[in-house]
Amino acid sequence: KNNLKQSKISISLDKGVFSELYQDIYFDKTNCIQESKHVYLDTNNLEKKFKNINNYIIAELGFGTGLNFILSWDLWNKNHIKNSSLLYISYESAPISIEQIKNIHKLFIGLSHLSKILIQKLPQIWQGTHQIFFEFGNVTLILIYNDFLSLKNFSFKADTWYLDGFSPTKNSSAWSNELYNEIYKHTKDGGSLSTYTVAGHVRRGLSDAGFNISKIKGIGNKREILYGYKNKVNCKTTKKPVLRYNDIGPVAVIGAGISGASLIYFLKKRNID
C-alpha cells in the first residue's frame, strides 16, 4: 500500500514557501535559517552535545525541504569530536520533488556547499527507507518516505527529536497520542525534543506520554515554542548507534576485488552480516 501524499509547493513574497497540500507554510523566506536554528538546534543545545557525545542520533517527523538536516550536519561538522558519528533519521509522508527542492535551496544562504551534496544524493520518490552516507560514512541520513506511524516498525532511540509536521490544525496525522507514545519509546533516557507549536493538546499529549514539557521563548513570528525531555536514568552508551529496520542476513558475497569489498562495506553500514 502506498501511503505517500503528493506534495504541491508554491513560493511567493507574501506566503514564503507554502504547501498547497496542507495550506500551511514550510517557513518564512526571509528568516528560515534563523528560525530553524533556534527552534531545533539551539533549543536542544546541540552545539554542546556534539562536542561531548560520540555517536549522536537525531530523529525528525517532517523532512520537508531538508533544511533542518543541513543545519544539523553543518553544526556537527563544526563541533564534533574525533571518531564520532551523526545518524539522522527523518520521516516524510509527502516528499517534495528534487526539482522543487533545488529551487527552495537557493534561499539557504551560506549552506550551498552542503545543499549541492544533498541534492545529488536524494533518492527518487518511492515509499520506503533510503540510506544516504556523507562525510566518509560518519554522517548518515536515513530518509523514510512513509506515514509517521511507520515509526512503530523501527527500533532505535534518539538523543533528540525534531517535530516539524505543519500546524496541528492542518496536518492532524502528525499530532496524535499514539504517535507521542511512539516518540517517547524511541527516545533515550535524558533525550530531548522541540517543536514550533504550543497547541494545548500537543503539550498535554507529549506530557501524558511521559515527557517533561515547557514553553520557552520563540523567535520572529513564533513567540513561544515547546521544549521537552525524557527523565534521565542512565544515558551513557559506548555503542555505535544502530537502526534496525529489516531482517536481512546473513549475506554471502561471492567474489573479491573492489566490487566485492564495496558491497561488504555497505552491507556492514546497514548492519547486515
Predicted regions and their residues:
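Conserved beta-strand signature within the Rossmann-like core of class I S-adenosyl-L-methionine
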Residues: 190-197
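Core SAM-dependent methyltransferase catalytic element
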Residues: 215-250
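N-terminal Rossmann-like FAD-binding beta1-loop-alpha1 element of flavoenzymes
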Residues: 246-273
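Glycine-rich SAM-binding Motif I of class I
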Residues: 65-70, 261
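Glycine-rich Rossmann-fold phosphate-binding loop(s) that bind the pyrophosphate
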Residues: 61-64, 255-257
